[in-house]
From Swiss-Prot:
NCBIfam families, per database record: rpmD_bact (TIGR01308)
Family according to the record: Belongs to the universal ribosomal protein uL30 family.
GO molecular function terms attached to this record: structural constituent of ribosome
Leader sequence segment: none
Domain of life: Bacteria
Protein's name according to its UniProt entry: Large ribosomal subunit protein uL30
Oligomeric form and interacting partners: Part of the 50S ribosomal subunit.
GO annotation, biological process: translation
Keywords for the protein's UniProt record, in alphabetical order: Ribonucleoprotein, Ribosomal protein
PANTHER family xrefs: LARGE RIBOSOMAL SUBUNIT PROTEIN UL30M, MITOCHONDRIAL RIBOSOMAL PROTEIN L30
GO cellular component, one term: cytosolic large ribosomal subunit
Length: 60
């Protein structure tokens, strides 16, 4: 199973409550913050919900 790096690139201001909760669940609070997660269907689903606010990179 791979890993992905998720970086917050846009603000959560004026976003829906669900999008804010997803960002919090991913561990993203500040713009430019990067977290590493396992490449699981749960994480990929959360990333898909906020794909316009984050950038994603695959890591080894």
């Amino acid at each position: 199973m791979g890993k992905i790096k998720v970086t917050k690139v846009k603000s959560a201001i004026n976003r829906t409550k669900n999008q804010k909760l997803v960002l919090e669940s991913l561990g993203l609070k500040k713009i430019g913050q990067t977290v590493e997660h396992d490449d699981t269907p749960n994480i990929l689903g959360m990333v898909n919900k906020v794909k316009h606010l984050v950038s994603v990179e695959e890591t080894k």
